[in-house]
A protein has these predicted regions:
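Short, glycine-/small- and polar/acidic-enriched structural segments
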Residues: 1-89, 95, 112-125, 129-142
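Short helix-loop capping/hinge motifs at secondary-structure junctions, enriched
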Residues: 21, 87, 153-162
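Short acidic active-site motifs
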Residues: 101-102, 120
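Periplasmic-binding protein-like
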Residues: 129-158, 166
Length: 333
């Protein structure tokens, strides 16, 4: 069972704005200014220009930090760079490290950039060692990130408890999504037992009003992180299959079998059952063509009130899991 409770636009790609050592991926005089010279205006919307500028700035292999080698941060990074002609992860050095240590790693010259959820990118900016290059939303505008996952046998044996978990996540997301809850949420998360960070830095991520560099430049990203609107927590099987398709291609796995298994992991049936009776407007479908929604679009739903946000990939590709499977079967025959 999988129930997403956060959307990857809350992630950001952060770049060192200091000089690096001779063995770094960027030349000694590289940094934020060189990327601007290479055409990146830090407008937070153009992932193609940002990626091309980053690739052009490298002298050797880029060193990029991610929280886990198998994570949405890594998948977005691989998709982005590979689409621009830099094979990933083969063409870059991916370093796994805890998010709270990433700003320190940038400062120490251990990595050139990192991709992780906020507020850790903003901490690099606060410490004067990094700049925010672009949000994950500019790579895939409505991608999944975090999951609530349990074993399928446990979900079957503990139907009541698993349903309560789903409802708790749903209600929490709905509350956090309310703008009036942001300041309190930031204050709670700032406590020493949680993030132990200034609440104003956390609030930036919740609002999407970001300071992106030590120059004090600001960018506002609508929907930077989503907790509720647009069926944000709905476990779309097509999103699970997109992840499986990427992994299968990179690791040499059977694509058809990978997509089949991925569809069994995301469980919209459990999600619907857990939220039945609370007047929540859920999608009528459990899968969709990923990357096909250009503007907010009404879709078939239980009460006819649901609108899905844009879900475009930066390169305008789409992913249709059914077509992918049909193509694989046809190729076999």
């Amino acid at each position: 069972m999988t129930d997403r409770y956060r959307i990857a636009p809350g992630a950001s790609v952060s770049l060192a704005d200091r000089t690096t050592d001779d063995d770094g991926g960027l030349d000694k005089d590289e940094g934020e200014d060189r990327l601007r010279d290479n055409g990146h205006g830090f407008d937070f919307r153009d992932a193609r220009t940002a990626g091309e500028a980053l690739i052009a700035a490298k002298v050797d292999r880029l060193r990029i930090g991610v929280p886990f080698p198998l994570s949405m941060h890594a998948e977005l990074l691989y998709y982005w760079l590979s689409s621009l002609g830099l094979p990933a992860p083969q063409g870059v050095d991916i370093k796994t490290m805890p998010p709270p240590l990433m700003a320190d790693a940038i400062e120490a010259g251990e990595i050139d950039a990192f991709c992780v959820g906020e507020p850790w990118g903003s901490i690099a900016v606060e410490n004067g060692v990094g700049a925010l290059l672009l949000p994950g939303k500019s790579i895939w505008s409505f991608s999944p990130e975090k999951v609530l996952a349990v074993r399928s046998d446990w979900a079957s044996a503990e139907t009541g408890l698993s349903a309560r978990l789903i409802r708790a996540v749903y209600r929490s997301g709905r509350w956090i999504a309310d703008p009036e809850s942001r300041l309190l949420t930031a204050e709670l998360l700032s406590r020493p037992e949680y993030l132990d960070l200034p609440p104003e830095v956390i609030e930036r991520a919740l609002s999407g009003n970001l300071i992106i560099s030590s120059r004090g430049e600001q960018r506002t990203v609508d929907g930077f992180v989503g907790f509720h609107k647009g069926a944000a927590n709905f476990p779309w099987r097509s999103q699970a299959q997109w992840i499986a398709n990427q992994l299968a291609a990179r690791m040499g796995l059977d694509r058809e079998e990978s997509l089949r298994q991925a569809a069994q992991v995301f469980r919209p049936d459990l999600y619907r059952a857990a939220l039945e009776g609370i007047a929540l407007d859920l999608p009528g479908a459990s899968s969709k063509i990923e990357g096909s929604i250009e503007v907010e679009t009404p879709v078939a739903s239980e009460y006819g009130r649901l609108t899905l946000p844009p879900d475009l990939f930066f390169d305008r590709r789409t992913f249709d899991p059914d077509a992918t499977i049909r193509s694989k079967i046809t190729h076999k025959n």
